[in-house]
């Protein structure tokens, strides 16, 4: 490889954000270089061996709809699949896959190595080359200068990474990997707003020392779900169960008696940890009334004896970890193979980014993943695909793109970050989206694949598959509208109908009944409806049964769209807007929202303040 050549895009970091960023840029046809400190760890699952979950599964489906890698890799590595919230409405149902770490890395590496326009090189990056307010390349650990027209940083927890086990601490990007100290210093020298965050991981346990008879077995779903719209159950490896156990009062006593040895409670750790994935120390303190906490006992893979005890993340001293682990049901003789630890790292205030994940200070420098204050593989991958795509679009001199809040959870994620920032690791939940009924897992392709095709992200295989699916849905919906269910059909459904039909109705109206599904319609031979795959019939049922609610949300979106279309000039000085409070002026001048709608999502910006902004725009004869 000629390392003196100019790359269009250099992606720094080969985790979940970096792999999606590199693949996205390369799919758009630009010459892309992925730099990683260790090629063998591309796509490494640094913490829990799982993909998806509430809110997170939605992100994975959206990445897949844009032809990303995560869902396909999860299908090839998933050793247990479940649909969470299966008994609830379609808006909050979410897919989760327990994954084999080794198989997942293998699947990601295979996709990277088979991608045209993408080169992989093993080198850590120590510095950025900045000239004339733009990044022109990177300097690697061994002194190589690699030139680029755009750079995407996806450096995870490696920036200034510090690992804590009890009162002992040492520099590290994660256990066994060095931190990026030089790059952290270089970025701090750019005067970007920086902070510290914390995350943690539990000790790993040898499964041969666990008594599973004391635990509740948790099998996967049957039939086995798939993640990718192009996936099939036949893609999955062997399926295995997980287990559930609980802490005991003895566990809690040991932890309480050793809180003075916890770096978090001793004040040694300055970074804020994830609210929704607290350490076991945090749980014991915050929920002091609880006598036990649930632990999910998850296999790390098919070819390893290591178990991931989800729910006991800790940074207590190793000897204390051994003590409290052995008070947990089934863990009485547990052998810890790796200690739990906490890690602190640098992140940069995401309010310093545009919605395209480019830094406002250096417009051809993009950030994605934990560097922006998020936590989770799925959140990182979602940012990665947007950052990599926009880096490529910028080079091609094409319009950059990010989905709106009403188009995708990816849009919710990015808008939350750039508008509100974050003081703790940000995790996606369905509750963060205003339009949950529109942003379901099942329709991510209908929402995003056509746009992905227009942008150049979506390849022929996915486009052909999607086009056939969409055509089947549309043609069947038309058939349902033009077909009639007659009163005499009551006889077919004596045991099913809550209330018999009083008059003939269109099949589309009949399907809206909660007790009726598409399979019932197939029983009426005179309708001549086609047999269809489950993912298509599910889509047809949801679109019809929730039509009223969906229409109402669409109307709300249209009302708010005028605010999204009311753009705020970047040069607008909010000190000139008569009537705004000093707090609002300060926030608007710092964040520089791009639209009236984004301004309204900033904490403290009231509807009255938005009205004053509108008046100012009209008086100044700025476009409204």
UniProtKB/Swiss-Prot annotation:
* Protein location: Cytoplasm
Residues at which NAD(+) binds: 273-287
Q: Which GO terms describe its molecular function?
A: flavin adenine dinucleotide binding
One biological-process term from Gene Ontology?
A: tRNA wobble uridine modification
Q: Which Pfam families match?
A: GIDA, GIDA_C_1st, SAM_GIDA_C
* Listed InterPro entries: FAD/NAD-bd_sf, GIDA_C_N, MnmG, MnmG-rel, MnmG-rel_CS, MnmG_C, MnmG_C_subdom, MnmG_C_subdom_sf
Q: Which PROSITE patterns match?
A: GIDA_1, GIDA_2
Gene3D superfamilies recorded: FAD/NAD(P)-binding domain, GidA associated domain, C-terminal subdomain, tRNA uridine 5-carboxymethylaminomethyl modification enzyme MnmG/GidA
**Which positions are annotated as binding FAD?**
13-18, 125, 180, 370
What is stated as this protein's family in its record? Belongs to the MnmG family.
Q: Would you tell me the protein name for this molecule? A: tRNA uridine 5-carboxymethylaminomethyl modification enzyme MnmG
Gene encoding this chain?
mnmG
């Amino acid at each position: 490889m000629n390392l003196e050549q100019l790359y269009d895009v250099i992606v720094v970091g080969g985790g979940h954000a970096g792999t999606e960023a590199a693949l996205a840029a390369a799919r758009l046809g630009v010459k892309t270089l992925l730099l990683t400190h260790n090629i063998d760890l591309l796509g490494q699952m640094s913490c829990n061996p799982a993909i998806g979950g509430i809110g997170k599964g939605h992100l994975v489906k959206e990445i897949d709809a844009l032809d990303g890698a995560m869902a396909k890799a999860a299908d090839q590595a998933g050793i247990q699949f479940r649909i969470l919230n299966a008994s609830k409405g379609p808006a909050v149902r979410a897919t989760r896959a327990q994954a084999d770490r080794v198989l997942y890395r293998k699947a990601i590496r295979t996709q990277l190595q088979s991608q045209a326009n993408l080169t992989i090189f093993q080198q850590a990056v120590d510095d950025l080359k900045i000239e004339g307010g733009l990044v022109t390349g990177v300097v690697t650990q061994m002194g190589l200068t690699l030139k680029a027209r755009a750079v995407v940083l996806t450096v995870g927890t490696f920036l200034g990474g510090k690992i804590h086990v009890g009162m002992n601490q040492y520099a590290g990007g994660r256990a066994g990997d060095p931190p990026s100290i030089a790059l952290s210093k270089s970025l701090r020298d750019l005067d970007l707003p920086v902070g510290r965050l914390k995350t943690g991981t539990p000790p790993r346990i040898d499964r041969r020392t666990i008594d599973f008879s004391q635990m509740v077995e948790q099998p996967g779903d049957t039939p086995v779900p798939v993640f990718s719209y192009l996936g099939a159950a036949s893609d999955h490896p062997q399926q295995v169960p997980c287990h559930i156990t609980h802490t005991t009062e003895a566990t809690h006593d040991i932890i309480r008696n050793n809180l003075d040895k916890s770096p978090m409670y001793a004040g040694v750790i300055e970074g804020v940890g994830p609210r929704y994935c607290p350490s076991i120390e945090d749980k014991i303190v915050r929920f002091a009334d609880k006598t036990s906490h649930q632990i999910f006992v998850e296999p790390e893979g098919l070819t390893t004896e290591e178990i991931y005890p989800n729910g006991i993340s800790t940074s207590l001293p190793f000897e204390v970890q051994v003590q409290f682990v052995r008070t947990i049901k089934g863990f009485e003789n547990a052998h810890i193979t790796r200690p739990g630890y906490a890690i602190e790292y640098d992140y940069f205030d995401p309010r310093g980014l545009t919605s395209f994940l480019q830094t406002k200070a250096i417009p051809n420098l993009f950030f994605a993943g934990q560097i922006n204050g998020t936590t989770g593989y799925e959140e990182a991958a979602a940012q990665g695909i947007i950052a990599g795509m926009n880096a490529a679009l910028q080079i091609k001199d094409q319009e950059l793109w990010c989905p709106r809040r009403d188009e995708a959870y990816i849009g919710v994620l990015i808008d939350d970050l750039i508008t509100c920032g974050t003081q703790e690791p940000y995790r996606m939940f369905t509750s963060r989206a205003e339009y949950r009924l529109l942003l379901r897992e099942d329709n991510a392709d209908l929402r995003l694949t056509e746009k992905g095709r227009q942008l150049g992200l979506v390849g022929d295989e996915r486009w052909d598959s999607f086009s056939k699916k969409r055509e089947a849905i549309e043609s069947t919906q038309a058939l349902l509208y033009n077909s009639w269910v007659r009163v005499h059909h009551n006889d077919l459904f004596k045991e099913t109908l809550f209330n018999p039909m009083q008059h003939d109705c269109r099949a589309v109206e009949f399907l809206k009944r909660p007790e009726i599904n598409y399979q019932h319609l197939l029983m009426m031979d005179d309708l001549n409806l086609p047999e269809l795959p489950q993912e298509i019939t599910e889509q047809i049922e949801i679109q019809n049964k929730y039509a009223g609610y969906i229409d109402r949300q669409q109307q709300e979106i249209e009302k708010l769209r005028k605010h999204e279309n009311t753009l705020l000039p970047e040069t607008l000085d909010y000190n000139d807007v008569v009537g705004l409070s000093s707090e609002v002026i300060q926030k608007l001048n710092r964040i520089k929202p791009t639209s009236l709608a984004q301004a309204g999502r900033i904490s403290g910006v009231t509807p009255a303040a938005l009205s004053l902004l509108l008046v100012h725009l009209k008086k100044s004869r700025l476009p409204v």
